[in-house]
Amino acid sequence: QLITLAKGASFVGHADSFAMIRGGHIDLCVLGAFEVAENGDLANWATSENDTAPAVGGAMDLAAGAKQVWVLMEHTTKDGRPKLVERCGYPLTGLACVRRIYTNLGVIDVLPEKGFVVRDLAPGVTLDELRAKSGATLHTN
């Protein structure tokens, strides 16, 4: 099946995309993460399975250059460890840059003065369950 462009679609080259990012022209970016700290620090370095050095790719540019950073991730690791933490244990990609987190259990805002604030819960998830699976304090409004 052929793929066609929608009306108004455009292409942007690699160099131009980084110029937009580094120039502060991106209003919102969505990234994955290994961990997010309650102050909004982001850790999402890719680790390699073939003995090459870990790499951050363009995420560091996005974390620094976008006006808002949202994160999409599972709430815990495969072995049940929390990904929402007081302080990141992995190398940081961006400092205090995350403003919202979407997980399979809920939506959490990151506010500078409060830390993690629960915005919404996934269907069937309780606040107690969300708190039990988090590694930092979750506040409510």
List PLM regions with ranges:
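Conserved phosphate- and dinucleotide-binding cores of soluble alpha/beta proteins
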Residues: 1-140
